[in-house]
């Protein structure tokens, strides 16, 4: 995973959405990432880490910019630092989401939005 992160260090956010995929500027080229491959996105200051099934990509962007680009694409903001893909959620317990070995906290301000986006029986 570290090799993938080093290879895809991003100089600038430059995200463009095209239906089922997004392009991010990695080094001096644009890299296509399929939206269905994104598990979650984590904010780290002015940088965002996009976690996919193949690895992770670091970009210079804000959570607000990414959330706007991915709105309506099966992603929901669950914390001020996390945006998750709904179909990658394995379970929700108390105040966190389980996605494989990763546990992501659910912020109080985002819990209602998450609940409304789930297909509850």
Where do the language-model regions lie?
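Conserved binding/recognition cores within well-folded domains
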Residues: 2-103
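C-terminal output/interaction extensions
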Residues: 113-121
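C-terminal structural segments of small proteins and small subunits
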Residues: 98, 105-108, 112
